[in-house]
Amino acid sequence: MKTVKVTTDNKISIIDVDFDDFRSIQCAIGGHFETVHTQLMADYFKDPSVIMLVDEEGLIKELPLNPVGSALYRSVIAGDLIFAQVRGDDIVAPDDAEDLKDRLLHTFIGLQEA
């Protein structure tokens, strides 16, 4: 399933992630993950189901700051992240990964395609 990944060095890309396999998510992020959602994200994406999956131990591991994630969370996000959506009890790929990527590229100065 296609999703958007944003790295700490401001690179954005479309990647394949099997959201039915937590190991696939861990591989994409680089460790154990947690979900992050804010009202700012819901407003920005015009969709309350959009979430970020971030490295749960990013700060403990002293990973670099993720500027995009930190801006959307309004607090420090350390490490790479991917976007997803919540559907009931499931975490699934975004409806339109390309549109999500384009929206982020137009908003965040310095963000570049990988």
Give residue ranges: language-model regions.
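Domain-length accessory/inserted modules outside core catalytic folds
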Residues: 1-114
